[in-house]
Amino acid sequence: MTMITDSLAVVLQRRDWENPGVTQLNRLAAHPPFASWRNSEEARTDRPSQESRSLNGEWRFAWFPAPEAVPESWLERDLPDADTVIVPSNWQMHGYDAPIYTNVTYPIAVNPPYVPTENPTGCYSLTFNVDESWLQEGQTRIIFDGVNSAFHLWCNGRWVGYGQDSRLPSEFDLSAFLHAGENRLAVMVLRWSDGSYLEDQDMWRMSGIFRDVSLLHKPSTQISDFHVATHFNDDFSRAVLEADVQMYGELRDELRVTVSLWQGETQVASGTAPFGGEIIDERGGYADHVTLRLNVENPKLWSAEIPNLYRAVVELHTADGTLIEAEACDVGFREVRIENGLLLLNGKPLLIRGVNRHEHHPLHGQVMDEQTMVQDILLMKQNNFNAVRCSHYPNHPLWYTLCDHYGLYVVDEANIETHGMVPMNRLTDDPRWLPAMSERVTRMVQRDRNHPSVIIWSLGNESGHGANHDALYRWIKSVDPSRPVQYEGGGADTFATDIICPMYARVDEDQPFPAVPKWSIKKWLSLPGETRPLILCEYAHAMGNSLGGFAKYWQAFRQYPRLQGGFVWDWVDQSLIKYDENGNPWSAYGGDFGDTPNDRQFCMNGLVFADRTPHPALTEAKHQQQFFQFSLSGRTIEVTSEDLFRHSDNELLHWMVALDGKPLASGEVPLDVAPQGKQLIELPELPQPESAGQLWLTVHVVQPNATTWSAAGHISAWQQWRLAENLSVTLPSAPHAIPQLTTSETDFCIELDNKRWQFNRQSGFLSQMWIGDKKQLLTPLRDQFTRAPLDNDIGVSEATRIDPNAWVERWKAAGHYQAEAALLQCTADTLADAVLITTVHAWQHQGKTLFISRKTYRIDGSGQMAITVDVEVASNTPHPARIGLTCQLAQVAERVNWLGLGPQENYPDRLTAACFDRWDLPLSDMYTPYVFPSENGLRCGTRELNYGPHQWRGDFQFNISRYSQQQLMETSHRHLLHAEEGTWLNIDGFHMGIGGDDSWSPSVSAEFHLSAGSYHYQLLWCQK
């Protein structure tokens, strides 16, 4: 044990938090989570251990601007003005200090290993009693599962130790410091340490004791470490469970270790051996180690599809069977290897349907509870994810147990990121920082290697590539050859990775950055000598209204076997709840706490909102990742299973044929598909519709029974096909009265029955409509070529750093947002059966014509207004965001009904998950409440829209809400939006894609640009 004077002054003078060579003092060696059962049956059934005690709850707390401001007296007694906080928590979530959101830029001046003298410091204290029996024999430990960023610990006024690395446990032996009766802990937590330079992840920077704190009593002679591994014969019919056990304490001849393997109540195998390891070298082996190997016939294999778990119980006992201590862990029999360029699980090539996940809660910051963890896993499984990357640090220990149980493949990532360094590998190539990096990697492996869900180790994130990475790669491969190692830094394909794991590489487009080119994923596979699998560690940046082009990735993944999927960035929006002056909650992002530097809303890239409500993009991910694929030939549906191990046993295929959303025929067929197999389903003769319309066949795969992760009736996959249909023939209608045209100096007015249309002759716009005496418009109907910018449109552009390449800056510079209409023509003609209004507008900015819009409005005797629009786009202006019409309707109706793609928001490059049907939703559901307001709520492929007394027919896209594009563009947070009078309707003939390969460069694929130069669309507007 390292000895140090107990006084606070001496500790402060040492400044351990500014020494990369000091990562801990007196911290115990890493190991898997322990419970120290004294009853093997309790270990087998994973009952709460009587030897473990939680210290979570209310602690006394005092905050200081720097450690030097902490009074020495605090070591002995609580300060008179100390507050009470809950542990675990981040102190910023309790009003102390401010959370800081920054992506790349360090939140402190970069001068490693030194940190600011103004270093916020939290002083925690707790009094507690210890059971007398714990003091008589054995060792009492205290375990801090996570403290950010560094801390010193005192017990009863005596200094115990020091720890850093905020995402792994720090465990100390308290035995020598405890006494009978009341004991007092004092924990001084520093916000910044030299470790902060290794923790530059894209997340909120918070502080405090934010994971569990507990006491554990172990016997003097104890199990100090154990790890398990599984090995197989060629066909996986026989396995060996290898258990390596290490003890601490007096090494006696009578000591034995028994390892027993259980499947529920059944013991599958057992073995007993004395200590004494295998011969290592000419000096012998480890006297305190023993390795046992248990043979298992026909093991039930673990996978994310079928997460079969056994239970291994490790007993330390005497030769006569007297139990000293038991530890245990769940065991999954599975094998991970790379062979012939493929990542294999149990001999089958994986397709990673992955997502990156930060530990984030909108109310609790970085504190994770079991309910939130389970909620995340259930949502992932329900949306066809099978893998999660712990970005960018080891997670709460419980997370891995839950992933074992529910079935998720895990990339376990070391808590290392130096993104803000110039160059990025400034620390990772420096041998002085190797000890700190080594502890972060080796301790992660030692804690988590018993989990079957962990199939890949990661050396960290965005830290360049340095010699320290190479050393740690070799250490992992030596200690744990059963798992591949991945690391993206330095180009994603260095010698420190078994997997090509780029971030944001595109499907077909090279990004030839200097030193670290980012090739297209297809090209990467064909580079000379490259034989590794490619799995994107990050792709499809889901920031706000995003995930356009996602289907293109999945087409490539299914086409090229060595493209084995990737991890979407990312799972959850990292917004935090704040409260206004009236106590109302609102969602905050970077800068909202006065935090500088900050990266604004870049913390919100999730497929789900912070409260876990899904973004519409999540449905697109679910559909593209679905485990059943379909094809149609005639009346035969071919169903292909992409499950590798699971035979379908809880799936029904529901099919339905509908004409314009009206069902004509339906049925259901049980699915009986072998892993990676096919099933042909012959549909009956389908009825021929008597009328014209769109005829669609839709199939859904439904789970009739509940599972551990889904309710009964869960839909796991779906597909639609448009079928051959009758031609639409419009027969001459019976004669109607001809609308009456009247002309004044200012207007053309058309009147028919109780309806009137008014066109302003000066503007050329439809300025008003009446039904009876009720006005229908609050603003004229006019062309629209812009949208409230998406995050993907903005990129990295901001007021202090304009990116001229961003779409929004190109549109602004060209004048798209400022363009004004110059009327070139406005005429009215009475035809034999209708009135025809013709207008021509030139949309101009600073004397330049950007768009020319020619429109005709034909109002016939039935009261229908047929609008025909032809738009020419100037060749020297950026491709517009949309080509359409907009107006503010006077009505606010409760519901919206449409025939088209839905029900969720969809865009031209994100619509494969949308189905054609007749949909009916509340008006409020047509708006997507992105925290940073933007264009939202579009529905594509629309043939008919009904709202209030109005109906629109044609082939168009629309969104409808209480918020104008102008308000969305000018508002920084969704809670600041106010419902406007009436309803804003946007009807687009054409809409640009939204992109999503990344959010900092233009990422809309060329096929989704509005680049044609001239556009034509038609619309029929009538009243019901």
UniProtKB/Swiss-Prot annotation:
Q: Which SUPFAM superfamilies match?
A: (Trans)glycosidases, beta-Galactosidase/glucuronidase domain, Galactose mutarotase-like, Galactose-binding domain-like
Annotated GO biological process: lactose catabolic process
Specify the domain of life of the species encoding this protein. Answer: Bacteria
Q: Which GO terms describe its cellular component?
A: beta-galactosidase complex
Q: Write out the catalysed reaction.
A: Hydrolysis of terminal non-reducing beta-D-galactose residues in beta-D-galactosides
The name this protein carries in UniProt is Beta-galactosidase
- Residues recorded as binding Mg(2+) 1, renumbered to this chain, are 417, 419, 462
Q: Which UniProt keywords apply?
A: Glycosidase, Hydrolase, Magnesium, Metal-binding, Plasmid, Sodium
InterPro entries associated with the record? B-gal_small/dom_5, Bact_Beta-galactosidase, Beta-gal/glucu_dom_sf, Gal_mutarotase_sf_dom, Galactose-bd-like_sf, GH-type_carb-bd, Glyco_hydro_2, Glyco_hydro_2_AS
On subunit structure and binding partners, the annotation says: Homotetramer.
Kindly identify the residues recorded as the active site: 462 (proton donor), 538 (nucleophile)
The UniProt annotation places substrate binding at 103, 202, 462, 538-541, 605, 1000
